[in-house]
Amino acid sequence: MRASYDVAIAGGGIVGAACAEACAAAGLSVAVAEPGPIGGGATAAGMGHVVVMDDSPAQLALTQYSRALWIERMAELPPEVEYLPCGTIWVAADEEEMQECRRKAAVAQAQGVAAKVLDGRQLAEAEPHLRPGLAGGLLVPDDSTIYPPCAARWLLERSRADMIREAAAAIAPGEIRLRNGGKISAGVAVNATGAWSPELTPGIEVRKRKGHLAITDRYPGFVRHVLVELGYLKSAHSLTSDSVAFNAQPRRTGQVLLGSSRQFGVEDGAIEAAMLRRMLDRCQEYMPELAALTAIRTWTGFRAATPDKLPLIGPTADPRLYLATGHEGLGITTSLATGQLVAAQICGRATAIPAEPYLPGRKQEAH
């Protein structure tokens, strides 16, 4: 470990790894404090969906920019990252949801994002295991999936950052204090510890949001695209109630990853049988044949949620302390963009997209 670094990052998940890689590429010396597995925590628990989302113009800008960065790197990604350009289909159960498909398509196309509205017949042809009678859907063909833990490890390896295998006890401008009594000194310290970031930076508006997931044995071709019910958007927007929504994702291994659930105010990471059953029942409502598949593992994780559904990226009131947290369910998608925004601001360069919507000092209003 050096006496001092240009940048010290707390957190070795995919966001911290992307920040390390981008800062190193900008010529900065980097250290990363992470006591656990690289790409553990929410990175290991997440679905790995790289997706453009349009809840707000700022969310659309960030996810579109970051998805483009993933596409640019497609040829570089090692096989273990399991990059799968399968596309997303937002599934509409009725005419009201079809109207939302058409709205989302118009927004996407206006921003240069490929999107195609599917009628019921086209949806059934694209995904024959969905239940009959669904109204249609919206295909976003350039979305993809990755295996996040391996992606995080790849990014950190590329960064050549010094790995400090100790937990951060506190973070201050230009300094990470370690639980073993040591410290990492740097020009800028970055808090990239996800759902645990308020423990290091008290007062920031980040809350834990628990989720359950399940994965099946190998059934190649059973699901061809990432499938998400449009009701997912309602559950994702709820800031108080527990919710579930159908989300099925193909893996390059042939497995099917199933979600999703959302819970606030739960600190215990244990699997809750009732919530898991509720989630799987919802999935079977959309894909009845899932009942015949064998689930081989279930787990939980904690998303880092903010009131306005946008991450905290950039300098705090003290420019020697940065935040890179609050990505909720979009940390995998937006990790590369987060790294680029952090590196550009540290170096005093112009950012590729406006940084203001994500700055930690913004006024947040719940969406």
Residue ranges and their predicted role:
Residues 6-31:
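N-terminal Rossmann-like FAD-binding beta1-loop-alpha1 element of flavoenzymes
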Residues 47-126, 245, 282-284:
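Dinucleotide-binding Rossmann-like beta1-alpha1 core, especially the glycine-rich loop
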Residues 21-22, 50, 81-83, 195-317:
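Active-site substrate-recognition segment that forms the wall
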Residues 15, 38, 196:
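Conserved Rossmann-like nucleotide-cofactor binding loop
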Residues 3-5, 179-188:
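Core beta-strand elements of the Rossmann-like FAD/NAD(P) dinucleotide-binding domain
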Residues 25-44:
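Glycine-rich FAD pyrophosphate-binding loop
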Residues 278, 284-367:
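C-terminal catalytic lobe of FAD-dependent flavoproteins
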Residues 138-174, 178-180:
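Helical element adjacent to the flavin cofactor pocket in flavoenzyme catalytic cores
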